Amino acid sequence: MKLLYFAWIRVKMGTSNESVDPPSTVENVQSLIDWMTRRNSVSSETFSDLTTIRIAVNQEYVDLDYPIKPGDEIAFFPPVTGG
């Protein structure tokens, strides 16, 4: 599974992407984030307020209950605003 980080999320995570192999109990976006936040304090801080983060799986916007599987590409980025 490939994770992509953009904008301030990339800065906080210290990388633009990483490949991970979460346990089989990780079945949707929310359980992936829960697993990620238990890995280290950086992830825990970065994903502490999910209202400031949008998520896409395989380049489609999704909700937290969206199912995921090995081989998926999951992107995390701030909401885009215009003006």
Predicted region positions:
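Ubiquitin-like/PB1-type beta-grasp interaction modules and other compact soluble beta-rich domains
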Residues: M1-G82
